[in-house]
């Protein structure tokens, strides 16, 4: 059964930094056939200062990076409107939530902001703290 593990910027940064917990989670997901993914906006948002560009390229080559298309932005905008949210903080979360809501189920999101992501994703998506 296809499933998806989505990483927000904190989860992706921890993967870049070889955090043992996140590495183990991603490896277990991959071994189980779970698709590990993030968004292009999340890749841009993740912490780059302490990470060698080659490490970033290597990590991103091993996970799915979803493009932020007009369709995705329309879905994200609808989520923001329906929850009366706005601004860049919520925009990036809404893009991740739009991808999560349309990804093969079951979907898990690894995030530093479980409250906002849970609100935007709804009950069909499992949210765990990074």
Language-model regions: role of each:
Residues 64-85, 94:
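Acidic catalytic patch
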Residues 2-4, 101-130:
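Acidic, PIN/NYN-like endoribonuclease modules and their adjacent C-terminal/linker elements
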């Amino acid at each position: 059964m296809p499933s998806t593990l989505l990483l927000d910027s904190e989860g992706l940064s921890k993967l870049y930094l070889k955090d043992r917990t996140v590495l183990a989670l991603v490896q277990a997901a991959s071994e189980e056939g779970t698709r590990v993914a993030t968004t292009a906006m999340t890749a841009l948002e993740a912490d780059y200062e302490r990470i060698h560009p080659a490490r970033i390229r290597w990590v991103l080559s091993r996970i799915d990076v979803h493009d932020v298309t007009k369709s995705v932005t329309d879905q994200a905008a609808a989520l923001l409107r329906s929850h009366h949210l706005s601004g860049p903080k919520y925009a990036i979360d809404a893009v991740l939530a739009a991808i999560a809501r349309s990804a093969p189920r079951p979907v898990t999101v690894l995030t530093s902001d479980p409250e906002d992501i849970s609100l935007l994703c709804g009950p069909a998506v499992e949210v765990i703290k990074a």
